[in-house]
Amino acid sequence: MKLSEIADNAGSRKKRMRVGRGIGSGKGKTAGRGGKGQTARSGVRIKGFEGGQMPLHRRLPKRGFNNIFRLDFAEINLDRLQEAIDAKAVDAGAVINAEVLVAAGVVRRAKDGVRLLGRGELKSKLTIEVYGASKPAIAAVEKAGGTVKILAPVKDEGEAA
C-alpha cells in the first residue's frame, strides 16, 4: 500500500448537485421545488400561517401572566444532600446553607435561595438553613436528629419579600 493508492470508499463523498442549470441536468427549470407559488420562492415561511384559516395560536384563548415577583429557588432532595455528605463535599457538623451548597457544587446556583425536598433518606444529623422546605423533608431531618431553619427570602433591593 502506498500513500498515493489510498482512496475514499465508493459513494462516501457525493458530489453536490447544482440546481437550476438547464433541463439536461435533471434539476433545471424549477430546481426540485415543484411548481410556482409561495413554496417555490426563497425566504422563510410564515410561522403559524395556515393558508388564511385562523391560526391555532389565535383560535385558543390567552391564559395566565408572568409574575415579576416570582422567586426562583434551587431545589435539592435529601438523597442528593446525603450523597454530598458521604462524598465529604459538605461537612455534616457545620451549618448547611445556600452558600455552602453552591461552593460544594451540590447546586449550580441559588438565585433566590435553596428549597429542600423530601426524596430519599437522611442518615446524618444536620443543621440546615434554607428558604423553603417541604413537610416530608422537615420531618426526615428532624427524625435524623437535625433542625431546619426557614429563612425569609430577600429580593435584590435588600428588602424582605
UniProtKB/Swiss-Prot annotation:
Region (Disordered): 1-44
This protein's UniProt keywords: Ribonucleoprotein, Ribosomal protein, RNA-binding, rRNA-binding
Disulphide linkage map: none
Pfam families: Ribosomal_L27A
Highest taxon above the source species: Bacteria
A single MF term (Gene Ontology): rRNA binding
Keyword check for tRNA processing: no
Gene Ontology terms: biological process: translation
Keyword Phosphoprotein: no
GO cellular component, one term: cytosolic large ribosomal subunit
Gly residues composition bias: residue spans: 21-37
Stated family: Belongs to the universal ribosomal protein uL15 family.
Binding partners and assembly: Part of the 50S ribosomal subunit.
Function comment: Binds to the 23S rRNA.
Name this protein carries in UniProt: Large ribosomal subunit protein uL15
Lineage: Bacteria, Pseudomonadati, Pseudomonadota, Alphaproteobacteria, Hyphomicrobiales
Gene designation: rplO
